[in-house]
Amino acid sequence: MASPKETLQRRAARVRRQVKAVANGRPRLSVHRSSKNIYAQIIDDVRGVTLAAASTLDGDLKGKLKTGADSAAAAAVGKLVAERAVKAGVKDVVFDRSAFIYHGRVKALAEAAREGGLSF
């Protein structure tokens, strides 16, 4: 039987494989969620560069958030990464939730990024 860590890695690889199959050259919005913070970055896999990034540890958000581990913080990160992506000239992305289910903080980040101008 697979350990929880192996199961997580398998699920992340499966999602990433599906994302790359439908990307068609579009950058991906990659999300990482820890117990205390949430991170998002727009990655261009063709060139291998990060185009925009934001997290709850970011200087622009650090003092404004009550905690980095709630849906409000995730929404703030989503809005900030969308602003930075639009400023960098990126509007169409593919959402890469990694091994996390589309619920709670991950969903809040995605919806805020859509409101901020990203389409996926």
Swiss-Prot record:
Q: InterPro entries from the entry?
A: Ribosomal_uL18_bac-type (IPR004389), Ribosomal_uL18_bac/euk (IPR005484)
Please name the SUPFAM superfamilies in this protein's record.
Answer: Translational machinery components (SSF53137)
Q: Does the keyword Ribonucleoprotein apply?
A: yes
- As given in the record, the signal peptide range reads none
Q: Which PANTHER family match?
A: 39S RIBOSOMAL PROTEIN L18, MITOCHONDRIAL, LARGE RIBOSOMAL SUBUNIT PROTEIN UL18M
Family statement: Belongs to the universal ribosomal protein uL18 family.
What is the name attached to this protein's record?
Large ribosomal subunit protein uL18
